[in-house]
A protein has these predicted regions:
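Second RecA-like catalytic domain
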Residues: 1-181
Length: 181
């Protein structure tokens, strides 16, 4: 989902309605798990009811159909690559067996260099370098009680550094998954 544009549409004339629909997918674990929820719902609708229904469903939920379609195409290419190299792919979106913690641990294993903790001053700081960071206003975590530890996928430089695509983590996961860090 990080390889495609933002999946959410927020037309200015229907901002409140769009925000309400988007909240159906949001979880306090962060943006990446929220994106996963959107994609799994899309994939389920596509498989169960077809492309035309899925287009309508995306429209009523203020989601970008073409962006989700592109993400699905990328998943198909990834599956083909796995198969070509002899790896089996277990389709888990039908009955998501992996827990949110399992998925977040996977995220930590890839994004551990982007770990940050909440400093007592109320500002996040990077584990390496102690650089001050803030949550981007588009993050679902922006309006929630700040999590103690997070990883982020992207930084945006404005007058301050803003974290985007954030996932809440447990600090013990860093010790296990990235002890070298």
């Amino acid at each position: 989902m990080l390889q495609v544009d933002n999946v959410f549409q927020t037309p200015s004339s229907q901002a409140a309605k769009a925000r309400s629909k988007h909240r159906e997918f949001e979880v306090e674990e962060g943006d990446l798990i929220t994106y996963l929820n959107v994609f799994l719902a899309y994939a389920s609708k596509l498989e169960e009811q077809g492309e035309e229904f899925c287009k309508h469903w995306c429209s009523t939920h203020f989601l970008k159909y073409k962006t989700l379609q592109r993400a699905n195409q990328l998943l198909g290419r990834l599956r083909a690559t796995l198969k070509r190299f002899g790896f089996s792919y277990q389709d888990r979106h039908k009955s998501m067996q992996a827990t949110g913690d399992d998925v977040r641990r996977c995220i930590v294993s890839g994004l551990f260099p982007n770990a940050a903790y909440l400093h007592p001053s109320g500002v996040y700081r990077t584990v390496r370098g102690d650089i001050p960071l803030h949550i981007h206003p588009t993050s679902i975590l922006y309006a929630l009680k700040p999590a103690t530890w997070v990883v982020y996928a992207e930084l945006i430089q404005t007058t301050k550094l803003l974290m985007k695509d954030i996932t809440v983590i447990e600090p013990s996961w860093l010790e296990v998954l990235a002890p070298h860090y």
